[in-house]
């Protein structure tokens, strides 16, 4: 069953009951993106919250998820809800819940998620017509949007004028806020992909509005070639993620891996924060290179479970990222990934490089000299029967390979048995490589994350290719039974 007003009403009713038990004077701020019925679902939520006695604020129009995340702290509300399905297909929609005050404005985690779910089930067992509604909620003006823009613009250290780049909003809500932030920061406006710059919940020009998907940046690349652009930046439809694409020496465009962008941003910010105390964090499946950056600049480093609901809760956080194009560059402002802020810091990095007469390619070379050549890959095995996921994870758990591609496994970690208590398997290799296996949280498949190191980028690519084939060879064995991988 897709998202509908009945489900939204049940969710809002259950969340309202939770908030009333959580805070003596509960309050909530509600946002929505440009997907079909997002505005309807947001108003339903506001009415039910107000009817339940929860003070409700509704953002003034379609806006990015990071603006909602910021509004929770700006108004010091008990909670926040964003109606969005991020980069999912057009027919999807979703309900993203945050807790403010003592929880810092991050996404809900256990046990709050389970407690809220139980209350939603209780509401669903009754008649939603019995839920009181009220129009006694506040429709906000642009004050909080302007405050977000001002705070985000301050991330740029200096103005710049000579950056030639392309931007696509992927039919989402990012462009208006990004454009105003660029103007405030004194950074140049991009060439835009006109067919994708304004919200359209049907996403007519892409198969999936996900900048990671093959072909999603085709129109942006076309504009970049016409404008002889240096690079492309893209937000996903709710603008909480950032993608970057660059041309190679032959003029062929390629997207930078999220680990590459994450380490570029992490290194840039680490140098700015030098002398401070704090933590650089990433999800467990993201690049181990961030820990090397933290070590060089005497910061703590931390690996969390997958998702910004965990990264955002890291104590003393200075910067966080996950390989799926999510970056948290300003933890004092929001405790969730923020594609607008990440774009500003990325552009400031480019500005800083230009000031030194350098390019992104030079920056990549310097990173390799400083920390080594890191590369990442992924193998996904889709299943038709969900039970196959458990069977494969059990086989790997009970019969872990002793070596992969001729390299010994130095350490095997089963996180079901650690304090993480999560279905994640980690294989650390003697040559510094790493394989992580985990079931997807959103799709019927198992994901294998591969990280490799080499003397230089070419050598690292060779090691990764051998690593990839080695993993596939193991999975084809009878013990694991994935002949088609």
Swiss-Prot record:
Keyword Magnesium: yes
Database matches in Gene3D superfamilies: Alpha-D-Glucose-1,6-Bisphosphate, subunit A, domain 3, Alpha-D-phosphohexomutase, C-terminal domain
Cofactor(s) recorded in Swiss-Prot or TrEMBL: Mg(2+)
Cofactor mode of binding and number, as noted: Binds 1 Mg(2+) ion per subunit.
PROSITE patterns: PGM_PMM
Residues noted as binding Mg(2+) in the record, renumbered to the chain: 86, 236, 238, 240
GO BP of this protein: carbohydrate metabolic process; purine ribonucleoside salvage
SUPFAM superfamilies on file: Phosphoglucomutase, C-terminal domain, Phosphoglucomutase, first 3 domains
Keyword Magnesium listed: yes
Family: Belongs to the phosphohexose mutase family.
Protein name per the record: Probable phosphomannomutase
Organism of origin: Haemophilus influenzae (strain ATCC 51907 / DSM 11121 / KW20 / Rd)
């Amino acid at each position: 069953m897709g998202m509908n007003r009945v489900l939204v009403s049940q969710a809002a009713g259950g969340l309202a009951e939770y908030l009333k038990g959580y805070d003596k004077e509960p309050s909530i701020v509600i946002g929505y993106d440009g997907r079909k019925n997002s505005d309807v679902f947001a108003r339903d939520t506001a009415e039910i919250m107000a009817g339940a006695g929860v003070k409700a604020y509704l953002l003034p129009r379609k806006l990015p998820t990071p603006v909602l995340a910021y509004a929770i702290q700006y108004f010091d509300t008990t909670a926040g809800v964003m109606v969005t399905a991020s980069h999912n297909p057009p027919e999807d929609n979703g309900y993203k819940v945050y807790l403010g005050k003592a929880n810092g404005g991050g996404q809900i985690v256990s046990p709050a998620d389970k407690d809220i779910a139980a209350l939603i089930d209780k509401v669903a067992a009754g008649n939603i017509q019995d839920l009181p509604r009220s129009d006694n909620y506040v429709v906000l003006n642009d004050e909080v949007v302007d405050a977000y823009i001002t705070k985000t613009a301050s991330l740029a250290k200096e103005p710049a004028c000579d950056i030639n780049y392309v931007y696509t909003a992927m039919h989402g809500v990012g462009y208006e806020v990004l454009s105003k932030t660029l103007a405030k920061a004194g950074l140049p406006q991009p060439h835009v992909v006109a067919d994708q710059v304004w919200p359209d919940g049907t996403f007519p020009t892409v198969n999936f509005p996900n900048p990671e998907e093959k072909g999603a940046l085709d129109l942006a690349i076309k504009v970049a070639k016409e404008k002889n652009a240096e690079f492309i930046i893209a937000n996903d439809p709710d603008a909480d993620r950032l993608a970057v694409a660059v041309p190679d020496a032959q003029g062929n465009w390629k997207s930078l891996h999220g680990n590459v962008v994450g380490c570029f941003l992490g290194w840039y910010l680490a140098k700015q924060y030098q002398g401070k105390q704090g933590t650089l964090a990433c999800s467990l499946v993201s690049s181990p290179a961030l820990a090397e950056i933290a070590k060089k600049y005497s910061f703590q480093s931390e690996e969390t479970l997958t998702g910004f609901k965990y990264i955002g809760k890291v104590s003393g956080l200075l910067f966080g990222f996950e390989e799926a194009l999510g970056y948290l560059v300003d933890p004092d402002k929001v405790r969730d990934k923020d594609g607008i802020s990440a774009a500003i810091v990325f552009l400031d990095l480019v500005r800083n490089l230009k000031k030194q007469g350098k390019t992104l390619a030079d920056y990549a070379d310097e990173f390799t000299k400083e920390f080594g050549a890191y590369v990442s890959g992924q193998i996904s095995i889709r299943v038709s029967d969900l039970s196959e996921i458990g069977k494969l994870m059990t086989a790997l758990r009970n019969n872990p390979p002793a070596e992969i591609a001729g390299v010994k496994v130095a350490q095997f970690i089963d996180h079901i048995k650690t304090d993480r208590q999560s279905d994640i398997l980690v294989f650390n290799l003697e040559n510094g490589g790493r394989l992580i296996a985990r079931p997807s949280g959103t799709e019927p498949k198992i994901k294998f994350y591969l990280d490799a190191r080499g003397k230089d980028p070419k050598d690292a690519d060779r090691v990764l290719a051998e690593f990839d084939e080695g993993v596939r060879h193991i999975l084809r064995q009878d013990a694991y039974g994935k002949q088609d991988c």
